Design a protein with these regions (language model features):
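Juxtamembrane helix-loop boundaries in multi-pass membrane proteins
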Residues: 5-33, 49, 53, 75-100, ...
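Alpha-helical transmembrane segments of multi-pass membrane proteins
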Residues: 28-37, 63-67
Length: 207
């Protein structure tokens, strides 16, 4: 009985492995970058940033493999997340991870930084096009669904120029930065309207 219950519990856990878990990886990537920059002032942090980078890469691989397993075994849950008015905004986290890692590797390996940046830019562009199209075309989105999480797809566009300029892609960097700023202003206006004239945002959805 215990064995059978365990086998039934494992698929349930996999179904509940949401796209939001990539936020942990993004947080670690950002923390690694902060420690790496701190190493310029405090050399003792240089070794710490190396270990943090290895840990972040391992965590990224682990989360990606688990989520890929979920996509293969439970594709219906992926579709539900994509159609969810809040969770859909967390898919660009993957692009942001690549973009932040491209900044981390600027001082370590320019070639790895370049490939990470290109991957992040492609994923960011695809995510932005599909998600913004979803915002415009979906009829089930309501003002109550507007949360700070809606900024996630846009913030990625603003990150692009950090490594993009170093790699010589000035025009592409300006394009993403301009798109990010324009949509950030639009979303900020909508969020302020939602906070003033509608019910307050739940605490669990606040940054």
């Amino acid at each position: 009985m215990t064995t059978q219950a365990g086998h039934e519990e494992q698929p349930l856990r996999l179904r509940n492995f949401h796209i939001t878990f990539f936020a942990i990886v993004l947080g670690m990537a950002g923390f690694t970058l902060a420690i790496q920059k701190g190493g310029e002032l405090f050399p003792v942090l240089e070794l710490t940033s190396d270990w943090l980078l290895y840990f972040t890469l391992g965590l990224f691989g682990l989360v990606s493999l688990v989520y890929l397993a979920k996509a293969v075994s439970h594709p219906d849950t992926i579709r539900k997340e994509w159609n969810h008015p809040i969770k859909i905004n967390f898919f660009p986290l993957i692009a942001k991870i690549f973009l932040v890692l491209s900044v981390v590797y600027l001082e370590r390996n320019m070639q790895i930084s370049y490939y990470a940046w290109v991957t992040g830019v492609v994923l960011q562009l695809l995510a932005s096009v599909f998600i913004i199209s979803s915002w415009i075309n979906q009829s089930h989105f309501k003002i109550e669904h507007m949360t700070p999480g809606w900024f996630i797809p846009i913030v990625g566009a603003i990150i692009v120029p950090i490594a993009g300029v170093k790699h010589g892609f000035l025009e592409i960097s300006w394009f993403f930065f301009a798109v990010g700023i324009i949509f950030w202003i639009a979303l900020f206006t909508i969020v302020m309207y939602r906070m003033i004239f509608h019910a307050s945002i739940p605490d669990r959805l606040l940054p």
